[in-house]
Amino acid sequence: MNHSAGTFPPVIAVLPAAGIGSRMQADCPKQYLTIGHQTILEHAIHALLRHPRIPQVIVAIGPDDQQFHQLPIAKDPRVRVTVGGQQRADSVMAGLQLAGEAKWVLVHDAARPCLHAEDLERLLAITEHSEVGGILAAPVRDTMKRAEPGRSTISHTVERQDLWHALTPQLFPLALLKLCLQRAMDDGATVTDEASALEHCGYHPLLVSGRSDNIKVTRPEDLALAAFYLTQLDN
C-alpha cells in the first residue's frame, strides 16, 4: 500500500457521534463501549488519523455528552468537537460547518471501528477521479426477502444482483455535500446516509468495493464480533 501515490488533496473527516444507540441495550451510548483498551469511537477515529491525507477529524457529539472530553483522543490537536443534533444529517451538517475551505470531506460512522487501511486507500484512490464522490460498499451475498407491509411474513424474494450494503466512510466534495444535504433536509427527505442526500439531488456516487468485516456495532452481539475483527487487524 502506498499512501503517497496520487495527488488527492487533504481530506477533512466528520464523525456523527450524537446518537444513543438504544438497540445496544447498554448503559451508555454504543460509541463509548470499550473494545480492548479503547472505546469504539476511539478505534474509529484512529483508523482515520493513521492516513496521512486526513489531517483533521471533526466529531459531532450530543449536547449532554459528558464522556468524550474524558477520552485521551480528545486531547489530540487533530481532533475537533462540535455539537450535533437529533438526526444524523444535523450532526453531519454541524461537522461540515467546521470543515473550512476543504475541498473534500469524508464521513464515517462513529460505531464502525473495523475500517481497514486498504479500504480507505482504495476509496481515496478511486474517488479522486469522480466529480460527485463515492462510498465504500459491499455486494449483497445473502438471499433478500421483502416482507408484506406491516407483517412478519414474506412477500417476495428481492433479486440481489446489483444490490450493495452501504458502508462508511463516504467521500464527497464538501460544497456538493453541504448543498445536497441542506436541500434534502429542507425537502423532508429521509437521509440515512450522506449518499442518499446526493441521490435526492439526482447525483450518482461511486460504489467502491469494501470489506464486509467493516461492521457497524448496532446490536449487543456485534460487540464480540468487532472485537474479533480488531484482533485480526492488529495482527
Curated annotation (Swiss-Prot):
**What HAMAP family does this protein map onto?**
IspD (MF_00108)
E.C. numbers: 2.7.7.60
Q: Which InterPro entries match?
A: IspD (IPR001228), IspD/TarI (IPR034683), IspD/TarI_cytidylyltransf_bact (IPR050088), ISPD_synthase_CS (IPR018294), Nucleotide-diphossugar_trans (IPR029044)
What keywords would UniProt list here? Isoprene biosynthesis, Nucleotidyltransferase, Transferase
**Which SUPFAM superfamilies does its entry note?**
Nucleotide-diphospho-sugar transferases
Which GO terms are recorded in the biological process aspect for this UniProt protein?
isopentenyl diphosphate biosynthetic process, methylerythritol 4-phosphate pathway
- Describe its partners and assembly state: Homodimer.
Q: Does the keyword Lipid metabolism apply?
A: no
Function, as annotated? Catalyzes the formation of 4-diphosphocytidyl-2-C-methyl-D-erythritol from CTP and 2-C-methyl-D-erythritol 4-phosphate (MEP).
Q: Which GO terms describe its molecular function?
A: 2-C-methyl-D-erythritol 4-phosphate cytidylyltransferase activity
Homology family: Belongs to the IspD/TarI cytidylyltransferase family. IspD subfamily.
Q: Which reaction does it catalyse?
A: 2-C-methyl-D-erythritol 4-phosphate + CTP + H(+) = 4-CDP-2-C-methyl-D-erythritol + diphosphate
Source organism per entry reads Serratia proteamaculans (strain 568)
State the protein's name: 2-C-methyl-D-erythritol 4-phosphate cytidylyltransferase
Q: In which pathway does it act?
A: Isoprenoid biosynthesis; isopentenyl diphosphate biosynthesis via DXP pathway; isopentenyl diphosphate from 1-deoxy-D-xylulose 5-phosphate: step 2/6
Q: Which gene encodes it?
A: ispD
Q: What class of enzyme is it?
A: transferase
The answer, when asked if Nucleotidyltransferase is one of the entry's keywords, is yes
